[in-house]
Structures are given as C-alpha cells and as structure tokens.
Curated annotation (Swiss-Prot):
Belongs to the bacterial ribosomal protein bL36 family. HAMAP family: Ribosomal_bL36. This is Large ribosomal subunit protein bL36. GO terms for biological process: translation. One of its GO terms (cellular component) is ribonucleoprotein complex. One of its GO terms (molecular function) is structural constituent of ribosome.
Length: 38
C-alpha cells in the first residue's frame, strides 16, 4: 500500500473506495497498484 498525496487509477482493474474519510485505490489482480491518499 503506497501513501500518496493524489491517487489515480493506473489500470482498468483498479477500484476507488472511500473508507473512514480516506480514499483508497484497490486492485485484487495487481496488488502493487494499491494506494491510499493522505
């Protein structure tokens, strides 16, 4: 999980989710794309 100031989709498999006021990018196929904002 990378922590970034701005999160973007890196592929079509990425899903953007809001949990507890934070924005996450989650990818089940390629877990290297997982990111969290802030």
């Amino acid at each position: 999980m990378k922590v970034r100031a701005s999160v973007k989709k890196r592929s079509e498999d990425d899903i953007i989710v809001r949990r507890k006021g934070r924005i996450y990018v989650i990818n089940k196929k390629n877990r290297r794309h997982n990111q969290r904002q802030g």
